[in-house]
Amino acid sequence: MSEEERPAALADTILRFLCHDDIDTVKELCADWFPIEYPDSWYRDITSNKKFFSLAATYNGQIVGMIVAEIKGRTKVHKEDGDILASSFSGDTQVAYILSLGVVKEFRKQGIGSLLLESLKSHISSTAQDHCKALYLHVLTTNSNAIRFYENRHFHQHHYLPYYYSIRGVLQDAYTYVLYLNGGHPPWTVMDYLQHLGSALAGFSPCTLPQRIYRQAHTLLRSLLPWSSISAKSGIEYSRTM
């Protein structure tokens, strides 16, 4: 889509990283967007600590959206999401966790959330290269708008987490959503193994395997015995009876 076709807000949006001076604004936005209360240390970290990817979308100098994420080794993933990647991936394989993604109400449905998410994915590709295999997040089961947003961008529900959040003293359920990148995948299920086995067996004709075994045994026997006139006729008959 060209600049002329974009909504005015998106065309005039400028991206920049959060800084310490943004703390008060970010606090106000998070209080409006999310029902969860974050400690002051969290705001200091996401605006100052370089381990976080904290990107703001600004319009006329005002923050109208932001995304906060952390790229980390798979061994640092919390226990409830420890099976996001199959165990075949090494311990230094990376994943990216979205801590926060929000847009001011008046600027929603104009592509700003997608712009922020795509910027994170581009950052992952340029810094972690192909070592980052998954991008994941948590979302309230009741947040249908957020769920729709992520599902429309190819995220898939990975876990149901009962009583995951405590909101104003009330325990509420969450989902884990995952987008796999660079060949990443979850552990195989029993159905995956059965499908793989079925695909492998589909490549064999009913007699292929017995014929292979016979030919190998026949070759070995000829190399061991003093005579080499063993007929292959029985092998042909064997294949016909299968």
UniProtKB/Swiss-Prot annotation:
Side Cytoplasmic, residues: 1-192, 237-242
GO biological process, one term: nucleosome assembly
Highest taxon, organism lineage: Eukaryota
Transmembrane segments annotated in the record for this chain: none
Binding residues for substrate: Y38, L99, Y165
Enzyme Commission designation: 2.3.1.259, 2.3.1.48
Region: Required for homodimerization, residue numbers: 162-173
Domain N-acetyltransferase: 13-182
Topology relative to the membrane: Peripheral membrane protein
Gene Ontology CC: one annotated term: Golgi membrane
Record: active site: Y97, H138
Signal peptide, first to last residue: none
Gene Ontology molecular-function annotations: histone H4 acetyltransferase activity; protein homodimerization activity; protein N-terminal-methionine acetyltransferase activity; protein-N-terminal amino-acid acetyltransferase activity
Locations listed in the record: Golgi apparatus membrane
Recorded catalytic activity of this chain's protein: N-terminal L-methionyl-[transmembrane protein] + acetyl-CoA = N-terminal N(alpha)-acetyl-L-methionyl-[transmembrane protein] + CoA + H(+); L-lysyl-[protein] + acetyl-CoA = N(6)-acetyl-L-lysyl-[protein] + CoA + H(+)
Keyword Chloroplast in annotation: no
One Pfam family here: Acetyltransf_1
Broad class of where this protein is predominantly found: Golgi
Keywords: Acyltransferase, Chromatin regulator, Chromosome partition, Golgi apparatus, Membrane, Transferase
Its biological purpose: N-alpha-acetyltransferase that specifically mediates the acetylation of N-terminal residues of the transmembrane proteins, with a strong preference for N-termini facing the cytosol. Displays N-terminal acetyltransferase activity towards a range of N-terminal sequences including those starting with Met-Lys, Met-Val, Met-Ala and Met-Met. Required for normal chromosomal segregation during anaphase. May also show histone acetyltransferase activity; such results are however unclear in vivo and would require additional experimental evidences.
Family: Belongs to the acetyltransferase family. NAA60 subfamily.
Subunit structure: Monomer and homodimer; monomer in presence of substrate and homodimer in its absence.
Protein name per Swiss-Prot or TrEMBL: N-alpha-acetyltransferase 60
